């Protein structure tokens, strides 16, 4: 049987007080609606439909390249009206209705719900809450069968005492929805077409309503304002931290730690406070990450030490390297075994050989360093001529003195030595000493000029 997933993402989200559509606000570094789309992909959806309205062009742009069909809800007239915009595109098989601002729903929960659905059964995800707040309530008969769902604003005092709540997540068939949605009425307190009214229609036809519940209420938490967004972010990060702790990762403080992508850790990894991991990050056995470090789309091999306040992006780091503090590794950086990039050093598109050291206050970009190289403080590879980038090639065991400018394209042969304060613009042969600076002049007894009174 086919599966259509419908994601409702047309709301304005006025309480977010933002020009950006609510579903595009980021949770763990990814738009809310993208989390839901990822879940739909895990379910193996035949077709995925995103109902858009407010900020439609922004949503379409953000989701460009994803396998989705867009349906426009020009006027927001309720959830039933939103789903109705997709009717012409739906198959007759199973249909799952999700929400673009409910990002943490799990595929396992939805699979259990979908397993309940056929032409004689409708599926509804419910959750029991101590404080139901503004949620719709599940009304059951004496035999425990669901007879209808009443929205909070339309509920009586007795109905508001019910703690089993509607999550809004519904599983039905396309045939059922095509029959029921055109019959919806807007005669209610909100003046909207409620999707939930289809449950009364199902009951009238003798169609059973099967219910399922999430493993945690966190799965069905929605976002309406910045406070809820922040709370959901922290809940999500707590969950990620607990998983890592269970896997044996040592976190200095699980409450001060963010994963905004995929993080894989080996044995005996230590992560200090305030660290952020974005994209696809791998930390090998025994890696230590110092406080307030950002690592994005990088692989860090076993035994590497990363000191505080370092930024590592798009880098490959081999075993037992040492990075930081206050180091910045930009995309294309590859550090070999036991190499070192120290404080206030920036690298970009650079290969640093085994045991080589760039200890402090340097920029090394578009460069290749062999093994055993020492780069003195204040060394700069001058790689850009205003139009094009050029490479610097440094052989094994080269020693570069402090405050040196290497004007690319330039090559330093193996074992070469560069005197401190030099500006090197021509190749240096292997084993040679190159010094390129003006001769010092000293005037004894020099008296500085004084201002006239």
UniProtKB/Swiss-Prot annotation:
<comment type="pathway">
    <text>Nucleotide-sugar biosynthesis; UDP-N-acetyl-alpha-D-glucosamine biosynthesis; UDP-N-acetyl-alpha-D-glucosamine from N-acetyl-alpha-D-glucosamine 1-phosphate: step 1/1.</text>
</comment>
<dbReference type="GO" id="GO:0009252">
    <property type="term" value="P:peptidoglycan biosynthetic process"/>
</dbReference>
<feature type="active site" description="Proton acceptor">
    <location>
        <position position="360"/>
    </location>
</feature>
<dbReference type="InterPro" id="IPR011004">
    <property type="entry name" value="Trimer_LpxA-like_sf"/>
</dbReference>
<dbReference type="InterPro" id="IPR038009">
    <property type="entry name" value="GlmU_C_LbH"/>
</dbReference>
<keyword id="KW-0479">Metal-binding</keyword>
<feature type="binding site">
    <location>
        <begin position="8"/>
        <end position="11"/>
    </location>
    <ligand>
        <name>UDP-N-acetyl-alpha-D-glucosamine</name>
    </ligand>
</feature>
<feature type="binding site">
    <location>
        <position position="151"/>
    </location>
    <ligand>
        <name>UDP-N-acetyl-alpha-D-glucosamine</name>
    </ligand>
</feature>
<comment type="pathway">
    <text>Nucleotide-sugar biosynthesis; UDP-N-acetyl-alpha-D-glucosamine biosynthesis; N-acetyl-alpha-D-glucosamine 1-phosphate from alpha-D-glucosamine 6-phosphate (route II): step 2/2.</text>
</comment>
<dbReference type="Pfam" id="PF12804">
    <property type="entry name" value="NTP_transf_3"/>
</dbReference>
<feature type="binding site">
    <location>
        <position position="224"/>
    </location>
    <ligand>
        <name>Mg(2+)</name>
    </ligand>
</feature>
<keyword id="KW-0677">Repeat</keyword>
<feature type="region of interest" description="N-acetyltransferase">
    <location>
        <begin position="248"/>
        <end position="453"/>
    </location>
</feature>
<dbReference type="GO" id="GO:0000287">
    <property type="term" value="F:magnesium ion binding"/>
</dbReference>
<dbReference type="GO" id="GO:0019134">
    <property type="term" value="F:glucosamine-1-phosphate N-acetyltransferase activity"/>
</dbReference>
<keyword id="KW-0963">Cytoplasm</keyword>
<feature type="binding site">
    <location>
        <begin position="383"/>
        <end position="384"/>
    </location>
    <ligand>
        <name>acetyl-CoA</name>
    </ligand>
</feature>
<dbReference type="InterPro" id="IPR018357">
    <property type="entry name" value="Hexapep_transf_CS"/>
</dbReference>
<feature type="binding site">
    <location>
        <position position="101"/>
    </location>
    <ligand>
        <name>Mg(2+)</name>
    </ligand>
</feature>
<feature type="region of interest" description="Pyrophosphorylase">
    <location>
        <begin position="1"/>
        <end position="226"/>
    </location>
</feature>
<dbReference type="Pfam" id="PF00132">
    <property type="entry name" value="Hexapep"/>
</dbReference>
<keyword id="KW-0012">Acyltransferase</keyword>
<dbReference type="GO" id="GO:0005737">
    <property type="term" value="C:cytoplasm"/>
</dbReference>
<dbReference type="InterPro" id="IPR025877">
    <property type="entry name" value="MobA-like_NTP_Trfase"/>
</dbReference>
<keyword id="KW-0961">Cell wall biogenesis/degradation</keyword>
<dbReference type="GO" id="GO:0009245">
    <property type="term" value="P:lipid A biosynthetic process"/>
</dbReference>
<keyword id="KW-0511">Multifunctional enzyme</keyword>
<feature type="binding site">
    <location>
        <position position="437"/>
    </location>
    <ligand>
        <name>acetyl-CoA</name>
    </ligand>
</feature>
<feature type="binding site">
    <location>
        <position position="374"/>
    </location>
    <ligand>
        <name>UDP-N-acetyl-alpha-D-glucosamine</name>
    </ligand>
</feature>
<dbReference type="GO" id="GO:0071555">
    <property type="term" value="P:cell wall organization"/>
</dbReference>
<keyword id="KW-0548">Nucleotidyltransferase</keyword>
<dbReference type="GO" id="GO:0006048">
    <property type="term" value="P:UDP-N-acetylglucosamine biosynthetic process"/>
</dbReference>
<feature type="binding site">
    <location>
        <position position="136"/>
    </location>
    <ligand>
        <name>UDP-N-acetyl-alpha-D-glucosamine</name>
    </ligand>
</feature>
<feature type="binding site">
    <location>
        <begin position="99"/>
        <end position="101"/>
    </location>
    <ligand>
        <name>UDP-N-acetyl-alpha-D-glucosamine</name>
    </ligand>
</feature>
<comment type="function">
    <text>Catalyzes the last two sequential reactions in the de novo biosynthetic pathway for UDP-N-acetylglucosamine (UDP-GlcNAc). The C-terminal domain catalyzes the transfer of acetyl group from acetyl coenzyme A to glucosamine-1-phosphate (GlcN-1-P) to produce N-acetylglucosamine-1-phosphate (GlcNAc-1-P), which is converted into UDP-GlcNAc by the transfer of uridine 5-monophosphate (from uridine 5-triphosphate), a reaction catalyzed by the N-terminal domain.</text>
</comment>
<keyword id="KW-0133">Cell shape</keyword>
<dbReference type="GO" id="GO:0016020">
    <property type="term" value="C:membrane"/>
</dbReference>
<feature type="binding site">
    <location>
        <position position="73"/>
    </location>
    <ligand>
        <name>UDP-N-acetyl-alpha-D-glucosamine</name>
    </ligand>
</feature>
<dbReference type="GO" id="GO:0003977">
    <property type="term" value="F:UDP-N-acetylglucosamine diphosphorylase activity"/>
</dbReference>
<comment type="similarity">
    <text>In the N-terminal section; belongs to the N-acetylglucosamine-1-phosphate uridyltransferase family.</text>
</comment>
<keyword id="KW-0808">Transferase</keyword>
<comment type="similarity">
    <text>In the C-terminal section; belongs to the transferase hexapeptide repeat family.</text>
</comment>
């Amino acid at each position: 049987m086919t599966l259509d997933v419908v994601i409702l993402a047309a709301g304005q989200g006025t309480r977010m007080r933002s020009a950006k559509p609510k579903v595009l606000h980021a949770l763990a570094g990814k738009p809310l609606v993208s989390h839901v789309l990822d879940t739909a992909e895990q379910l193996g959806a035949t077709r995925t439909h995103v109902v858009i309205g407010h900020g439609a062009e922004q949503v379409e742009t953000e989701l460009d390249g994803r396998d989705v069909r867009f349906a426009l809800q020009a006027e927001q007239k309720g959830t039933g009206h939103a789903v109705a915009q997709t009717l012409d595109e739906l198959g007759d098989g199973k249909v799952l209705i999700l929400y673009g601002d409910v990002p943490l729903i799990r595929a396992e929960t939805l699979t259990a719900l979908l397993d309940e659905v056929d032409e004689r059964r409708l599926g509804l995800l419910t959750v029991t809450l101590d404080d139901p707040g503004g949620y719709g309530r599940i009304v059951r008969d004496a035999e425990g069968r669901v007879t209808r769902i009443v929205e909070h604003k339309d509920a009586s005092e007795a109905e508001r005492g019910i703690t089993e709540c509607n999550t809004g997540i519904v599983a039905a068939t396309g045939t059922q929805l095509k029959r029921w949605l055109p019959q919806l009425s807007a005669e209610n307190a909100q003046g909207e077409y409620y999707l939930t009214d289809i449950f009364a229609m199902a009951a009238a036809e003798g169609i059973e309503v099967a219910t399922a519940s999430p493993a945690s209420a966190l799965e069905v938490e929605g976002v309406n304002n910045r406070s809820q967004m922040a709370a959901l972010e922290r809940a999500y990060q707590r969950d990620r931290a607990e998983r890592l702790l269970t896997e044996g990762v040592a976190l200095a403080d699980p409450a001060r730690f963010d994963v905004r992508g995929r993080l894989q850790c080996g044995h005996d990894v230590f992560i200090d406070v305030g660290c952020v991991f974005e994209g696809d990050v791998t930390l090998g056995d025994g890696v230590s990450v110092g406080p307030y470090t950002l690592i994005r789309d990088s692989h860090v091999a076993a035994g590497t030490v990363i000191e505080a306040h370092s930024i590592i992006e798009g880098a490959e780091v081999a075993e037992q390297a040492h990075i930081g503090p206050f180091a910045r590794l930009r995309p294309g950086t590859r550090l070999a075994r036991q190499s070192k990039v120290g404080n206030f050093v920036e690298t970009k598109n650079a290969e640093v050989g085994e045991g080589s050291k760039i200890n402090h206050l340097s920029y090394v970009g578009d460069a290749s360093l062999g093994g055993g190289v020492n780069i003195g403080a204040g060394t700069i590879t001058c790689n850009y001529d205003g139009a094009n980038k050029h490479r610097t090639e440094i052989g094994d065991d080269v020693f570069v003195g402090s405050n040196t400018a290497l004007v690319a394209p330039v090559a330093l042969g193996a074992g070469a030595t560069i005197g401190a304060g030099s500006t090197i613009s021509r190749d240096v042969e292997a084993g040679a000493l190159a010094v390129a600076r003006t001769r010092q002049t000293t005037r004894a007894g020099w008296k500085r000029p004084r201002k006239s009174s």
